Amino acid sequence: MFCHLRPLRRFGLRKVLPHWLHYSRALSGAEAINALRPFYFAVHPDFFGQHPREREVNENSLKRLSVYLENLQKPGFKSLKPTQLTFYIREKTAQNSSEGQEPISTTGFRAVRFTLHSSDLLSTVLYILNSCSLPVEHVQSLNTNVHSQPLKEATGMPDRPIKWHRSYYSFTGFKDPDEDLTHVSRVETTLTSWLGSNGKGAVKKLRNSLPLRKELDRLKNELSELLQLSDIRWQRGWGVAHRCSQLHSLSRLAQQNPGPLQNVKGCTVVFTDRSGMSALGHVMLGTMDVHHHWTRLFESLPSYFDLQRRMSALEAQISNLLGGIQVVYIEELQPALTLDQYYSLLHTFYNQLLRSRVPPHPHPQSLSGLQMILSSDRYAPSLHELGHFDIPALSDPASLQSFMRTKAQQARENMTRREKLKVMENELIQASTKQFSLEKLYKEPSISSRQMVDCCKRLLEQSLPYLHGMHLCVSHFYSVMQDGDLCIPWNWKKGEAMK
């Protein structure tokens, strides 16, 4: 049941994982962000203004961490490749270096390296905090089903944290971390104060990035026209300079070896971590791969197109067996799968239906207009609040049909609400963009339509002159990106932050 904790033992963390972890409910995304606040405070790029190299390392690592946490929260998530991260941690008092950590430098920070490999959100949060030698007591308070011994007994920690007298900080010249946390709680979690403190810096970064942004648009348009592409996208939050570099690389390949690239006509190209074709049929170009790998991919596209046709036929056969319901892949809610992986999942489910000899649905089109997604987990089928059915590939077909018939009307109602919510979201994005004269307003994939609607409604009640001409991203935390984009949490606070 708890096999996902085994990798932690190799790192000597078995003793420091709280005993109550084994009796806890799943941690929500919002609770995970809240639990990681001490970590975000220790690594936030804004505190590394005098150290551009360390700042960039933290910015890039935070992006990769955000992607990892987002994938952990997707329904049907099974596993991720181990992700190695490096962060520079702000230090105020001397500590002994431990495994995976470098000694503290004279500049007031130390480097910490760790590898994420857990498929559980709670154990991932605890692993991050422990790797950075940060407290974990507050995580226990987030869990409502704790029925075991207190944290101090499970971890062997002292009864209370060490609290130094003010004279210690006066004598040593170090800052009291409690005062820093209090200041950040008041300023960073208040939208107007945070914008006031960071607006000018963001404007400067945005202005500096404008030439590269124009170059990016030019390259994207030229390549789209040259290769007759449907679109060019990026799966990660790379900066403008990195995106330009990737497009230049593709442009050079198109000039040096144009033949294989004729196969990409009409496709969407996505720059990501690995090369191949996605479950949606997008051509994925791994940014760490060389031109030789890209060329082989372009040459093999005809075989991928054939697999796409077989996949569509398989989806149609499944639909016919299950009353006309549409089998879909929703990128925002499912783990990132290649076309091969998704076809294998469909094939497993189809064989499950055939082996059970389930008779055709008594009303062939009774579920027409409804949608279902397939997952690789072993949980029971469920109906998502957005209206689609989340179906494990190894579900019992007989009980599955009964479940779908019972929930069909509720699914249609959920889908109707989803469509109305999407329309409202688009209207509020347009209204907010116009009211604040934003150059761009967008959200991270992990932000739901409901969260975006709530955020925009509250924004429209504010007077925010700092946003004029800016790029605003609705996310889970505050940050100024390297090219000047402002990230704010969807549930931002106004006035005094809640303690």
UniProtKB/Swiss-Prot annotation:
Presence of the UniProt keyword Mitochondrion in the record: yes
UniProt feature coiled coil, ranges: 206-233
Tissue expression pattern: Expressed in peripheral blood leukocytes, mainly in T-lymphocytes.
Record keyword ATP-binding present: no
Gene Ontology cellular component list: mitochondrion
Keyword annotations of the record: Coiled coil, Mitochondrion
Spans traversing the lipid bilayer: none
Broad class of where this protein is predominantly found: mitochondrion
Induction behaviour: Up-regulated during induction and maintenance of graft acceptance and down-regulated during graft rejection.
Subcellular location: Mitochondrion
Pfam families: DUF4460 (PF14687), DUF4461 (PF14688)
InterPro entries registered for this protein in UniProt: DUF4460, DUF4461, TCAIM
Role description: May regulate T-cell apoptosis.
Protein name: T-cell activation inhibitor, mitochondrial
Organism from which the protein derives: Mus musculus (Mouse)
Gene: TCAIM
